[in-house]
Amino acid sequence: MAKLVECVPNFSEGCNKEVIEALGRAISQTPGCTLLDVDAGASTNRTVYTFVGTPEAVVEGALSAARMAWELIDMSRHKGEHPRMGALDVCPFVPVMNISMEECVICAHVFGQRLSEELGVPVYLYGEAARQESRRTLPAIRAGEYEALPKKLEKPEWVPDFGPPAFVPQWGATVTGARTFLIAYNINLLCTKELAHRIALNIREQGRGADQPGSLKKVQGIGWYLEEENIAQVSTNLLDFETTPLHAVYEEVCYNAEALKLPVVGSQLVGLVPKKAMLDAAEFYIKKEKLFILEEEHKIKLVVSRLGLDSLSPFNPRERIIEYLVQAGQEDKGLVTKPLGAFVRAVGGRSAAPGGGSVAATAASLGAALGCMVGLMSYGKRQFEQLDSIMRNVIPPLHQAMDELVAMVDADSRAFSSYMEAMKLPKSTPEERERRVVAMQQGLKTAVEVPCTLAVKVNNLWSSLKMLAHHGNLACKSDLQVGAKMLEAAVFGAYFNVMINLKDITDEKFKTETSQMVTRLLEEAKQGSALVLALLEKREA
């Protein structure tokens, strides 16, 4: 699969529609770049562009937009609520799919060097690309903003990483770097700018200084007034949403606002958000309110409602969640997108993949789906009211496994294909032969790891199936019996696929450990299936 990098350039223009559109065209017309989002703010006088592409393409896209900004933006006239120091204020590169942080650091270095050479402007590196610890954070570099640059550039400690230590009034300076996914998130309040900033100081990690740190790690914050909406905002950057998630920021602002007797009236996501950040927030509110929600779409709706993400403008998940946008922009050629008949014919075709591994994953997903169905058929009606708490615990792991196991249909096929591709590598020289052998061995190990993972996922479901066998709707008895045997058959399939690939692996320790593990997993599946079937046989209608 192609490497995918996200680039999020922030330009200091949020009012002039012609300039905003011209910068967007410069990006979207760059080969290999897909422009996902344009978020312009009049009060901040700033526009955030989000686009994705290969490492090479996103560097070219960012440079194209920078060249256009050089022609259209004059920083000497810029005014806005948001801190800034340049026409292209900041340009981070973010790993999205099949790419490392180190590769994004290279993107930042290449971009910074080329930008400084072409335009003759100072460029600083931050985040994971920083060459100095004092420049890791954006606020540290941007301190004093554009107005402080003339004197700042004269100081030895502020010599740019690229370009001349000279003030360019038209441009200012640019910061580029590599970082994890940053979420720009604002909470709306009916109050003054000063009160919003007071809350921002309470929650941001920096707080009011070293002796008064804030309550939330990896969070930057500032208070401002949004003139076009006539509200104040606590504007935050979540530098690591795994450390401090969306809902934690919202709840902390609400807590502080309540103490000050201030109303919170929803919130706003600027730009795009990872799906995981939304689902983590959903799980928080599901647990907090003891809700029962299975479908991803419904979980997203819950978060939009609880955080008030549609308070200022409609929130369309298909346009705001990066995974949905990336999927929409790519042609999906996976096996699971095929009609059932086409998938069966693909299995029956004259090629090694899809084969037994994909069929085993299909069986596993269908087994989990049948278990999920039986659970749902035993829930939500008055006659099953006494089973409510049991089914709320039993159904979610089956529903989750159903989705995860479907994805493994393609994962198995891809894993085997990587081995087949390695076999085609050139072998004319000793070096080429060595590379080919290493690639083939890695391909075989990957081909083994996928069915092992499948077997583990299946065996995690037996406790749920046992509960269904005890308590589930007896009208669905045969469905649960079929589901149990499908899951058992899937582990048999995983076992056979592992064993046939192990024989060609030269790592004896890996072979022994994997063989023992998959044999144990097969025995566990046999016992789990037998117990479920025995429990069902004892029950009478």
UniProtKB/Swiss-Prot annotation:
Residue ranges, annotated region (Formiminotransferase C-subdomain): 182-326
Localization terms from the record: Cytoplasm, Cytosol; Golgi apparatus; Cytoplasm, Cytoskeleton, Microtubule organizing center, Centrosome, Centriole
Database matches in NCBIfam families: FtcD
Keyword Membrane: no
MF terms (GO), sorted A to Z: folic acid binding; formimidoyltetrahydrofolate cyclodeaminase activity; glutamate formimidoyltransferase activity
Catalytic reaction annotation: 5-formimidoyltetrahydrofolate + L-glutamate = N-formimidoyl-L-glutamate + (6S)-5,6,7,8-tetrahydrofolate; 5-formimidoyltetrahydrofolate + 2 H(+) = (6R)-5,10-methenyltetrahydrofolate + NH4(+)
Subunit structure: Homooctamer, including four polyglutamate binding sites. The subunits are arranged as a tetramer of dimers, and form a planar ring-shaped structure.
Linker: annotated segments: 327-334
GO CC annotations, alphabetized: centriole; cytosol; Golgi apparatus
Name by which UniProt lists this protein: Formimidoyltransferase-cyclodeaminase
Described purpose of this protein according to its UniProt entry: Folate-dependent enzyme, that displays both transferase and deaminase activity. Serves to channel one-carbon units from formiminoglutamate to the folate pool. Binds and promotes bundling of vimentin filaments originating from the Golgi.
InterPro entries: Cyclodeamin/CycHdrlase, Formiminotransferase_C, Formiminotransferase_C_sf, Formiminotransferase_cat, Formiminotransferase_N, Formiminotransferase_N_sf, FormiminoTrfase_cat_dom_sf, Formintransfe-cycloase-like_sf
Keyword Lyase: yes
The enzyme's E.C. designation: 2.1.2.5, 4.3.1.4
